[in-house]
Amino acid sequence: MDMEGKGNAEEASRLFLQAWNEATNDFEKYIAAYFVARHQDNVPDKLKWLETALQFALNVNNEAVVSAFPGLYLKIAKCYEDLGDVDNAKKNFELANSFSGDPSDKGPFYHGTKADLQVGDLLTPGGSSNYQPELIMNHIYFTALVNGAGLAAALAKGDRHERVYVVEPTGSFENDPNVTDKKFPGNPTRSYRSQAPLKIVGEVTDWVRQTPEQLQTWREKLAISRGEIIN
């Protein structure tokens, strides 16, 4: 992916194919096939790899992949459309639409911060962004991955200790558009946001901490992406 980001498509294609050949489980094969598909020069080959990615995603069929189904079916539909196969294009467009809607993830969910809060407190939108202090956030963000919440806590503004709270949404929520279908297909980080409050129902203390070097790398990446937050 680093090669792809640097515009070295040929080397990126070679490495993605190597990842496919070395994949050891269905999730790895799904991800690798998806990226191999992106580097195909013709529609039939692109379609073949997209359908391969879809099959392995269907084999996995958990919350790490279901958010990718709309995009996968849509890309497959467009391939069939380009090939003049109206029936298969229509079928896959309909399948893409069938997976739209609110996420089905049941949690548990976590929110990382440096704020000192208590069980029963409500987290609400309207605070300033951890990454762009001048930006007032219209949503409250959370994740189903405790280590992701731990990273958010480490990157949060303030000098207090990192805290990861177990939270329950009090209203509907959506996939975080800042990460969904961006670097990876769908929302494998299970990152969400809501305009409704989150209720704190507990706290966890056990998650994988980032090293100072890793945190600095994250801060540098966030500095580069300033101005790109979808609010």
What is the predicted role of each segment?
Residues 81-82, 87-107, 112-114, 130, ...:
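Conserved NAD+-utilizing ADP-ribose enzyme module
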Residues 1-14:
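Alpha-helical segment of the N-proximal tetratricopeptide repeat
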Residues 7, 41-44, 84:
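Residue-level detector of the short coil/turn that links helix A to helix B
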Residues 18-26, 57-67:
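Flexible helix-coil transition and linker loops at the boundaries of alpha-helical arrays
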Residues 30-33, 73:
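TPR repeat positional signature
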Residues 1, 34-37, 77:
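Conserved small-residue packing positions in alpha-helical repeats and bundles
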